[in-house]
Amino acid sequence: KKNVVNFLNQRKNQSGIIYCLSRNDTDTLCDYLNSQGFNALSYHAGKSADEKLDAQNKFMTLQNVIMVATIAFGMGIDKPDIRFVIHLNLPGSMEAYYQEIGRAGRDGKPADTLLIYGLDDLVIRRKMIEESDSNKDYKFNENKRLDYLLSYCESPECRRKTLLGYFDDVSNNCNNCDNCLDPPNLIDGTVLAQKLLSTVFRTGQFFGQVHVINVLRGSEDKKVLEKGHDRLSVYGIGKDKSINFWQSFLRQLLAFGHLQINFQKYGAIQITESGITILKS
């Protein structure tokens, strides 16, 4: 919420769309934004036809209004002065993301996009795919599409160039996205990867992100102590890096296919064959 409000405070008197994954998140964020002085509406499939029509009409006719919605909102919407699109969760694919951010800036003027996500979003998306009634091939393709989106999110390259490249469209750097304006510092992450992968391995590949990072950073968390993981050789070998650093680094290992999430084991982080190769190198 803090990141969203900070973003909106820099764009006072502008209209935009905020996409949420769940109906509850949609209503909760809408109420919060209104309490902070913003003019926000909510839209999702759980609302009545009259409620949805009223919200849509207000969004289309009023200025300086924010629509907080699930993906149920958007089809056929052509409001030219949408200045921003925020995703509060990871979209389902590059195609969905491209379509949704394309609703901003249709008047030809500059518009902004913001994508906020964490590992929990990836877990939810993977679980939605695995628990669907679709066939094996469809699930495989959906997971690959999600892989591409995760790679896009974690890429240090120009956002526009990477996004258009996915659709086989050649583009130069835009000199306008976060990676172009503030390029990330690239490092040789081999040793760091080995530390994280080794921690996943030594803890048995039974635990999620929080526990793995707690062990890596030498946390005295109750669960770490109860499991005896404070006595492992990897305990504390990554204490020189912050929690945020390791969360980001873990997402990158997932994006590059060196780690995977096992939903049969409640979202446990596990090492892939390519991850084992790095660990042994």
Name each region found by the language model.
Residues 8, 59, 153, 200-204:
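Short helix-to-turn junction characteristic of helix-turn-helix DNA-binding domains
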Residues 81, 124-128, 145-149, 162, ...:
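A general alpha-helix detector
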Residues 12, 156, 205:
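Flexible coil/turn residues that form the inter-helical turn or adjacent wing/linker of helix-turn-helix
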Residues 1-136, 141-144, 168-172, 178-179:
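Helicase motor core with emphasis on the C-terminal RecA-like subdomain
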Residues 145-170:
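C-terminal accessory regions
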Residues 141-143, 170-281:
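Accessory DNA-binding and partner-docking regions appended to nucleic-acid-acting proteins
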